[in-house]
Structure formats: C-alpha cells, structure tokens
Amino acid sequence: MKKVIVYIDGSNFYFSVKSRFNVKLDIEKFCAKLTKDKNLACIKYYIAPIDQFSNPNMYAKQQSFFDNLREIKNLQIIFGRLEKRKKDGEEYYVEKATDVNLALDLVLDAQSNSYDEAYLISNDGDFSGAVKASVERFNKKIVYVAIGNKKSISYHLKNVSSKTLNIDEKFISDLKIE
C-alpha cells in the first residue's frame, strides 16, 4: 500500500476554501477522502501563528483551531512566523518561513523515502521547484490539490505535478463544518 503524506499550506488553504466555497472544512475528513485507499502516514499543516498582543480575538480563535488540529491523528503543525511591516503609515503582517518549511519538507521527505505519494494543498506556484525536484530526482508522485477558480489555480504547479485534483463543491459537500 502506498505511503502518503499530505502537505497543507494552511493560510493558502483557508483563504482558498473561504473565497471559493465560503465554508469551513473538516481537515481530517478532507485528507482521508483525498487519500482514500492509501496509507496516510502523516498530515503536515504549515501556518504562522498570530501575535496574541496585536489581535487578541483572532489569536484566541486561532489557538482554538490549533487545539482542534492537535486532536487529529498523525497531524503535525509546523509554524512559521508573522513579521510586522509598515507602508504608508499602515501596519500589516507578512507570513515568513512557512513556504520554505513546506518546500524543504517535501524534498527532504522525498529524499528519505518517507512517502511514495504526496498531496500538496496550495495554489502557490513558488512550490513548483520543490515539486519538480521530488518528481524528477526522487521519482515521487506529487498530486497538486487545486482549490479555487481557474484564475487561482497554479499553472506552474499543474505543469510539474504528477496529477492535478480540482476540488469542487461536490467533493466537499459532506466535509463542511457548521
């Protein structure tokens, strides 16, 4: 049975699902449905935590979300960070290290033979180099899980992945959280 790891770009996943379907999904059931008859070894969820002092309400909601994630068997949360920036007097945050962590794990896990097949849940074309290396150098099957409309789906990921799986309303119909 093929050993599978699911890699989730958390922020990208959240905003893609929200903009496309305007729902919250049960991540455990979503990953199980994606990988159905395969050996799901691990789910890796990459995210940058919100600073508790900059936005206490969002921080509390995110911590509750993390607590729910920690209940999922074989799920690892890999944290990046948020860096505060200022432009034209306005403060905003930029997510750092999450994409690099995911790309590194995808390639290093391929090299160490931790998976036969990986599912990448992100529309970020910056992952195309890591996907290409995993497919070509380590002979791994990488499934690009595309969530969104045709504009948001990454042409670069589609080109280098072994397979593209477009998520539609029908796929998620039984995975919604109220």
Residue ranges and their predicted role:
Residues 1-94, 137, 141, 148:
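Domain-level signal for Mg2+-assisted phosphodiester chemistry and nucleotide/NA-binding surfaces
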